Amino acid sequence: MAKVAFIGLGVMGFPMAGHLVKQGHDVTVYNRTGAKATQWVEQYGGKKADTPKDAAQGQDIVFTCVGNDDDLRQVVLGEHGIVHGMHAGAILVDHTTASADVAREIAAYIEPLNIAFLDAPVSGGQAGAENGALTVMMGGDQAHFDTVKPVISAYSRCAELLGPVGAGQLTKMVNQICIAGVVQGLAEGLHFAKSAGLDGLKVIEVISKGAAQSWQMENRYKTMWQGQYDFGFAIDWMRKDLGIALDEARRNGSHLPVAALVDQFYSEVQAMKGNRWDTSSLLARLEKSRS
């Protein structure tokens, strides 16, 4: 059993922290909105703290899962941040999808304090978090990875070390770049099927048995065909992730024309008041263009 803190109880962090309790770990949570932490304690047990610093005190491992770079800096380095509560020898594991730069920044800040850092963004969405089946992409030191991997197994089906600090975030960027292209292709395929008078559900059932198969196809085609877009990762968050990837691409010289185009398409869906629709709502944009 490990003594851990979990900072950030959003749609991902809430069930992830719950899985840690279910696996027998001693868990203390903190959330910016205190009512959410109270709800979590009522549902899972464990303890809650009033500040990130308080949550981190005495813990072997501290997990964070917050919104963006600035949120991460605040909960780690702020006046009441985690860094002021962690002890030497502890490990900070960040599940936020953030920039590789902020991962390196935090690692460099806490290294002189003998606190280890692993960037560890996840993939699998809310369903993956609830079912304990996330994929975790990690950057950092092998020994620290080996220490935290058994704990992370509470909510993951795959956790791999990809390289030094920052490698986890860079891998998550690859993940989001790939998803953008796949979802746009699926949206175009369904749009074409509808325009051609085909039964889209039957079409997907057939082609998903062949080379076109993908996770997005298997999990999103029915809701897309029905025009329902509240079953997955919100566009606002996807645009944040693509923005991070496109910024990194400008620095490393990568050319991402499809990702940049899909990001623009998502901005058009936002203009349709679809900010909280999931990423499969690219089909809604195509349907609107036909009407």
Curated annotation (Swiss-Prot):
Entry's EC annotation: 1.1.-.-
A molecular function (GO) term: NAD binding
Residue stretches in coiled coil: none
Keyword vocabulary terms for this entry: NAD, Oxidoreductase
UniProt keyword NAD present: yes
GO terms classed as biological process: organic acid catabolic process
Stored InterPro entries: 3-OH-isobutyrate_DH-rel_CS, 6-PGluconate_DH-like_C_sf, 6PGD_dom2, 6PGDH_NADP-bd, HIBADH-like_NADP-bd, HIBADH-related, NAD(P)-bd_dom_sf
Superkingdom classification of source: Bacteria
Enzyme class of the recorded protein, top EC level: oxidoreductase
Catalytic center residues: K172
Residue numbers binding NAD(+): 5-19, 97, 240
Pfam families named in the record: NAD_binding_11, NAD_binding_2
Similarity comment: family membership: Belongs to the HIBADH-related family.
UniProt protein name: Uncharacterized oxidoreductase Sfri_1503
Source organism: Shewanella frigidimarina (strain NCIMB 400)
Lineage: Bacteria, Pseudomonadati, Pseudomonadota, Gammaproteobacteria, Alteromonadales
